[in-house]
C-alpha cells in the first residue's frame, strides 16, 4: 500500500499543472463572477449562458467539457455542488471560501495574481529550472532575452499584467499590516517612502488610516509612468541602487527578495541615508521569513516562493537568521520580526 501511495503522489505531482490551468480557465471564463451575480448556486446551463453573454459570442460554450471543468474544481474545493431532485436531478454550483478570492470586483481578489503566474511568459521561465541548478544562469533572461525589469519596461502588455498582479495583493497585505501592526505604524510622524511601491496602492492605503503621514511612492520609471494620481501621494521615479528619497521612515514590500545579499546591503545602506529621523527612524520590511521545519498556514506557499524568486529575479527568500545577518551587515543592530496572518512577515530595522 505504501508503494501505491508513493506512485499516486508521483501521478499527482506530474499533473499538478492542471490545477493551475483549470483555475486560470475559471478566471478567464469568469465562472465565480457569474455565480456571484445570481446571489445563489446555479445550474451548469446558467453558467454557460453567463459565459456566452460575457463574451458577446453567438457560439455556445462546450457544455460537456465545462461540466468536466466544474467537476474537477468541485473536487478541488474551488466550487461547491449540491443536487436538487425535482423532475430530474440537477446539479447546482456555488462559491466556496476559495472561489470568493477569484471574484474580479472583490477588493482582495487574487485573480490578477493567478493570471500573471499562469501566463505563458511566466510559465516559460520554469522550463529552465534544470539549467539553473546546473549553472546558475539567469532563467528569465534565458527565456526572454533580458531580465524581468527590462522585459517589463519594453513590453507594456506584460507590464500591465505584472502591475495588476502586484496591485491585487496590496489590500490583502496592507489589511493584515494595518490590523496587526497598529503600534508600529501609529508612532511614525512625518514622511514615509514606499520603496518599490508599484503604482502607489500601499502608501495610499496607509495614508487613509494615518492621515498625519505624508506619502512618497518610489519605483522604476516605467512603473511610475503607469501610476494613477492618488490623493496626497507623491510619485517619484528612480533607481534604488543610486539613492532613495528622504523620509522619516522607509517601507519596502517584496523588494529585497529580488536581489542578492550584496545588492540588498547596498539598498539598505541607501535606506539608512534616506532616513532623516536618526533617533526614531526605521525601515519596515514586508518579506517572507522562511522556516523549512514549520507546517503552519502559508508555509507551503513560502516554500514555492523559495523556488520562484531565484528563477525570476536572481534573488532569494531568507530565514530569520539570514535576515538578521543581512541587516547587521548593512549597519542595523536592532531588529524585530513580527509574524502576521499573510505570507510575509514584518521585519523592523531601527537606526539606533
From Swiss-Prot:
User: Where mainly located?
Assistant: cytoplasm
A biological process (GO) annotation for this entry? Answer: methylation
Keywords noted in UniProt: Cytoplasm, Methyltransferase, S-adenosyl-L-methionine, Transferase
Q: How is its activity regulated?
A: Inhibited by S-adenosyl homocysteine.
**One Pfam family recorded for the sequence:** Dimerisation
Expression across tissues is: Highly expressed in lupulin glands. Detected in early-, mid- and late-stage cones.
Q: In which pathway does it act?
A: Secondary metabolite biosynthesis
Catalytic reactions of this protein: desmethylxanthohumol + S-adenosyl-L-methionine = xanthohumol + S-adenosyl-L-homocysteine + H(+); xanthogalenol + S-adenosyl-L-methionine = 4'-O-methylxanthohumol + S-adenosyl-L-homocysteine + H(+)
Gene3D superfamilies, A to Z? Vaccinia Virus protein VP39, Winged helix-like DNA-binding domain superfamily/Winged helix DNA-binding domain
Role of this protein: Involved in the biosynthesis of prenylated phenolics natural products which contribute to the bitter taste of beer and display broad biological activities. Catalyzes the biosynthesis of xanthohumol. Methylates desmethylxanthohumol and xanthogalenol, but not caffeic acid, prenylflavanones, simple phenols or phenylpropanoids.
* PANTHER family the UniProt entry points to: O-METHYLTRANSFERASE
What protein name applies here? Desmethylxanthohumol 6'-O-methyltransferase
Q: Which organism is it from?
A: Humulus lupulus
Amino acid at each position: 500500500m505504501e508503494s501505491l501511495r508513493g506512485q499516486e503522489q508521483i501521478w499527482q505531482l506530474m499533473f499538478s499543472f492542471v490545477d493551475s490551468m483549470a483555475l486560470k480557465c475559471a478566471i478567464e471564463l469568469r465562472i465565480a463572477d457569474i455565480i456571484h451575480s445570481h446571489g445563489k448556486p446555479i445550474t451548469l446551463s446558467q453558467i454557460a449562458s453567463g459565459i456566452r453573454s460575457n463574451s458577446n459570442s453567438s457560439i455556445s460554450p462546450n457544455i460537456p467539457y465545462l461540466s468536466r471543468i466544474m467537476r474537477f474544481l468541485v473536487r478541488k474545493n474551488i466550487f461547491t455542488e449540491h443536487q436538487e431532485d425535482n423532475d430530474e436531478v440537477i446539479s447546482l454550483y456555488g462559491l466556496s471560501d476559495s472561489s470568493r478570492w477569484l471574484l474580479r470586483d472583490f477588493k482582495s481578489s487574487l485573480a490578477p495574481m493567478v493570471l500573471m503566474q499562469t501566463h505563458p511568459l511566466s510559465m516559460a521561465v520554469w522550463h529552465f529550472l534544470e539549467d539553473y541548478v546546473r549553472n546558475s544562469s539567469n532563467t528569465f533572461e534565458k527565456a526572454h532575452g533580458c531580465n524581468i525589469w527590462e522585459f517589463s519596461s519594453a513590453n507594456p502588455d506584460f507590464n500591465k499584467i505584472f502591475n495588476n498582479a502586484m496591485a491585487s495583493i496590496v489590500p490583502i497585505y496592507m489589511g493584515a499590516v494595518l490590523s496587526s501592526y497598529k503600534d508600529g505604524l501609529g508612532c511614525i510622524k512625518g514622511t514615509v517612502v514606499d520603496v518599490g511601491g508599484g503604482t502607489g496602492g500601499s502608501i495610499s492605503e496607509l495614508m487613509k488610516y494615518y492621515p498625519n503621514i505624508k506619502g512618497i511612492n518610489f519605483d522604476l520609471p516605467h512603473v511610475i509612468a503607469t501610476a494613477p494620481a492618488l490623493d496626497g501621494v507623491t510619485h517619484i521615479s528612480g533607481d534604488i541602487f543610486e539613492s532613495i528619497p528622504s523620509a522619516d521612515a522607509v517601507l519596502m514590500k517584496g523588494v529585497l527578495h529580488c536581489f542578492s545579499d550584496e545588492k540588498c546591503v547596498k539598498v539598505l545602506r541607501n535606506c539608512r541615508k534616506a532616513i532623516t529621523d536618526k533617533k526614531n527612524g526605521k525601515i519596515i520590511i514586508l518579506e517572507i521569513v522562511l522556516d523549512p521545519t514549520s507546517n503552519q498556514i502559508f508555509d507551503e506557499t513560502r516554500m514555492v516562493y523559495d523556488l520562484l524568486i531565484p528563477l525570476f529575479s536572481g534573488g532569494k527568500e531568507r530565514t530569520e537568521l539570514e535576515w538578521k545577518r543581512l541587516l547587521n551587515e548593512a549597519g542595523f543592530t536592532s531588529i524585530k520580526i513580527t509574524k502576521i496572518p499573510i505570507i510575509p512577515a514584518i521585519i523592523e530595522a531601527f537606526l539606533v
